[in-house]
């Protein structure tokens, strides 16, 4: 932690984002969890990831800075957790139509203002996004992973990008 700012500045010099000599660089990885508060395993997964990094994979941390954002949407998560605690069945009801799986509006997916933060990256209208983008741009990580859940009947696949890339995507990215 003592060298964190030095590492960050070195990384920005290597990327060409700020002036300075290019030198040895560590990989910067940013992990975002729980942008949809009702994707409930996400924040717990962030804690497991942090634990595993410091107990099982410490060698990775010699060459990598890992930034963990454990809960991008704390308002939505809090709303979902309160809903679930009030409505869960004991024993748990796995029927998709049971009340514990049917949140009322304004559900945990959105922030306090009923805004889906996962739709705010381009427009940056929400305070949470503004602050996160500022910090993200302070680091410009090599890798960003945005963790989500998916429904059992709605899998999805995002193919890797192909050329030509958009003009605002730099060679460094």
Tell me the role of every PLM-derived stretch:
Residues 36:
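Conserved phosphate/anionic-ligand binding catalytic regions in large, soluble enzymes, centered on
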Residues 3-32, 40-173:
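Active-site/substrate-binding loop(s) of hydrolase catalytic cores
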């Amino acid at each position: 932690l003592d060298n964190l700012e030095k590492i960050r500045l070195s990384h920005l010099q290597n990327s060409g984002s700020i002036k300075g000599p290019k030198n040895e660089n560590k990989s910067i990885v940013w992990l975002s969890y729980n942008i949809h508060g009702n994707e409930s395993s996400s924040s717990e997964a962030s804690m497991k990831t942090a634990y595993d990094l410091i107990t099982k994979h410490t060698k990775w941390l010699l060459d990598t800075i890992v930034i963990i954002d454990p809960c991008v949407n704390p308002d939505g998560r809090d709303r979902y957790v309160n809903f679930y605690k009030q409505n869960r069945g004991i024993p748990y009801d796995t029927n998709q139509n049971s009340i514990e799986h049917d949140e009322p509006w304004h559900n945990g997916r959105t922030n306090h203002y009923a805004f889906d933060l996962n739709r705010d990256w381009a427009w940056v209208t929400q305070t949470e996004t503004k602050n996160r983008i500022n910090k993200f741009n302070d680091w410009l990580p090599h890798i960003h992973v945005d963790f989500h859940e998916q429904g059992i009947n709605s899998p999805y696949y995002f193919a890797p990008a192909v050329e030509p890339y958009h003009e605002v995507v730099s060679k460094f990215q």
